[in-house]
Amino acid sequence: MTLEELNRTSPFHAGAENTAFAPYFDGTSYLNMLSTEQVPVGCVTFAPGCRNHWHIHRAARGGGQILLVTAGRGWYQEWGEAP
């Protein structure tokens, strides 16, 4: 699916090229901030072949990050569980 098709058919538009966080990705990603108010919500779109580096999201309370995958496949690691 092209970016144009994604932006036309999905409620989760790709947004602008994610240059601010580019050091954490191999390849091109796009960021569309859906909310910046009380709970920041961002939609990150990975171009074909893009991946991000293993990392952790910590939070003082609640969850550090919640992932909602809309297409494709990926890997994640749960704390305390075998990879």
Q: Where in this protein do the model-derived segments appear?
A:
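Generic structural detector for well-ordered beta-strands
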Residues: M33-S35, T45, Q77
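Short glycine/serine/threonine-biased micro-segments
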Residues: F25, A47, T70-G72
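A short, N-terminal "cap"/entry segment at the start of jelly-roll beta-barrel domains
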Residues: M1-P40, H53
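Ligand-binding pocket scaffold of soluble enzyme catalytic domains
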Residues: V44, P48-C50
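Intrinsically disordered, low-complexity regions
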Residues: A16, T28, C43, G63-G64, ...
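A short beta-strand-loop-beta hairpin characteristic of the jelly-roll/cupin
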Residues: R51-P83
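Conserved hydrophobic/aromatic positions in well-ordered beta-strands
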Residues: N32, G42-V44, L67
